[in-house]
């Protein structure tokens, strides 16, 4: 007999151990002979990471598919691993050194510091792997990989050197996102926009050959900027070619205030004639758009910042070129050189004001890009970096999606994919860090570059180049973490070696990931997979949405609305969390997570546990020779039919990535049809004297529960595994763990039995609804009068007389030609069901109660409708607040409909 309650905390570790002992998650475990492969690579979490809700959703979805396909007998591999997370890991270890008052990385030296990171990884890294196991992730943990392990590092070297020799990797001076705190280039995904209350400064730039007069607008043009310090690097002013105000000025120069540099006025579509004065100052070395304008118009790029974002003028050859060093300019250089960018901003504005160049200052709230790790505003910065020719690699990756070799689900994301790929920029792959794959480039005495897989090979290449041995210096930069991640689907399978795993599992079947890394990771895996394997890396990309809080707001520490999945698992168990995420994971829709929902789905697990316990108490046990087609009782043939239908719906739902529909179908069958109705129908049979009926009911219930454990296993693996082991045939053990049991393939259906019992369910449900709407006391028994019933319906009433009376609290059933006075009515098929209410409730009092309720609902609806009609409210209120009001309005409309139905019934009864 089962324990009275299911203890998730005690059971889950025990079940995990059982799976481990059975080798249930090993590649190919439980596969049928000659089975098709089903391979999934996990999006590698950062080695520094801890499980968050995004991981929980992502890995729940993967695990549902992996367990499902394993039970279907496929040759399954779920490949786990972790990312070395360059910046994040380096920062964690640097912080640890500071906390322990140990020498910093510069004092320690590169080699010792990297040793220290490996030591940290051995002690603390990989916590997330254990957290994923706790969630129930059925990866082949014996194959866990790390993006810095030896095999993957070899793959990285092979790819870098090959691309370099093919001319697809090169060094170039371009703008990058530069973090002046961490002193490295960072990728777009590591940049977060923050709304800042700042200013827009409007400056007067004097026209050449005209004496400058602040009072005379014909002697200058006005430009506006949010970053006055960058004006020191201005090399042009752009106007729109269609803007007639400036036609005569195009080709002339303005004089850069404070500096005295002559800079041209150029015609370029980037300038918006509708925005401000229609002119734009162009600083190619400090703005991504300006960089492109500069290239189009042959403008110089003058960098005026140090890597730490201080002003550099004194020894800045580019800045000083062609300038007349007046006493005023020399004083400016002395004052500003070495000054922090924000202090320089303040001083430049003061100087512009003093000298008559400041037109006005506007308050201006705007988005300022910050480094998500360093936390300071980033600078577009001109440096020498390594680049991949992404445009060339993108072509086959676009073709693969266009011709359907790789499908993106939901399909609407394909447009985003193509938009990105068609406008792709060179990919900056170098980072100024120590932790990561060091770039395999060595420089000779004249800076000639040798890119090889090892120092020995670089020395041999240098010897061939110079005709003698020379000292080589290795590039100190490391590769962008996304570079090694882009090789993940084939590097984890042993490439560049030709391994059996690579031959079996590549291309992989499906990739499950968040839409936010479609470009940063998915597109790059497509590029690398097609280039090096000449084959797509995956057949399907399933993009899931975000997990938000219950109001639809994005979770963030600053808002204090972060939901911790580990805490949820502590409180409700892993199964409840997983099932909640699955049933809410509708394609393309964010998951609004309310912990109350998780409590509700824990109750679903409790319902299944209690149903199994109830079954055991009534002698339900597996009958080895049970066959659905041999069942005789309509109620058994009905539940077996509904089981087949539910199995079909769950199977189709998982197979088509509609996880919410699959979970919903399982939920409805278990909670509604099996627990609420079938077990209720069985009670008189279990208590009766018909032993044959009892035996058939026991065998049917056992069979159904056995299939239910299988259907629910991908969603709720722990509880179902426990129930499976505790409900084996008497005196026997199960042949296998549930994780390796065969997925149900059911075909039994009896349309007549299903129609018959579903009619009974609809009748009882309808009568109960009317009673609830009419406020009929729960204990009151009422007669039922039936009008217009055909022979089939009359027979059904006769056949189910006892069940109707017991379940719907019906006193007697009669068939009449006319509805009795004071009766509420409902339609069921061709018949009208009348429930006389006069003797059960005070119709007048009930009518008054309903009228009052209708008034309250109408007033509340009116209030919300006025609110939503207010454009100011919709524009200024937080998105989740507006959404909550819309949802409340929908709820009220449904409530109003219910009250209107009840009022109509009262009128009919009166």
From Swiss-Prot:
Name of protein: Valine--tRNA ligase
Chief localization: cytoplasm
Species: Brucella melitensis biotype 1 (strain ATCC 23456 / CCUG 17765 / NCTC 10094 / 16M)
Coiled coil: 842-910
Subunit organization: Monomer.
Gene Ontology MF term list: aminoacyl-tRNA deacylase activity; ATP binding; valine-tRNA ligase activity
Enzyme class name: ligase
PANTHER family per record: VALINE--TRNA LIGASE, CHLOROPLASTIC_MITOCHONDRIAL 2, VALYL-TRNA SYNTHETASES
Domain of life of the organism encoding this protein: Bacteria
Any GO CC annotation of this UniProt entry: cytosol
One Pfam entry name: Anticodon_1
Alphabetized InterPro entries for the sequence: aa-tRNA-synth_I_CS, aa-tRNA-synth_Ia, Anticodon_Ia_Val, M/V/L/I-tRNA-synth_anticd-bd, Rossmann-like_a/b/a_fold, tRNA-bd_arm, tRNAsynth_Ia_anticodon-bd, Val-tRNA_synth_C_sf
Residue ranges annotated as motif 'HIGH' region: 45-55
